[in-house]
Amino acid sequence: MSFRLFNGDAMKQFTLPLDKERQRPTLYLKSFFGLSAMLDTGAVLPVWVEDEELLQNMGAIKIAKNQPFGGFGGMTTGTLYRIPLFRCGDLMFPELPIIASRSELSCQMILSATMFSGLIYEIDDFHHKFNVTIPDTESIIRKLIIEDSNGKLHILCSGEEM
């Protein structure tokens, strides 16, 4: 992690490489079993698109089946899991909620925009980098909470210090 001054404020910053061979912004999560993840700035929930058995083998805990959620161009259903500790670069997500919904993508998971709520992030397609800046008002420890509102799942994100 490096530190930069933005408007006189020192902010933490890190950069992850994007896969140069893919048209969609995809990164490899060295800190999470080396899996690949696509960044989706329109996604509300993180989504596991690979086999659920693999997710369970990595320690994820099944919470509920047949959960309706919006995505992939409409409403669908999936199984809600919690990953005990998920890392993306310098960010840590304890008890990360993730929906498992099999899809034919060339990655194992989709990282949602809500995971980076309150942060400054840039998908630099020219240099193939994902740059994340963490303002002093935010933490590297991110807490995502899924709430059910009238049968629709939505997610809240807060940075919390441990």
Predicted regions and their residues:
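Pepsin/retropepsin-fold aspartyl endopeptidases
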Residues: M1-M162
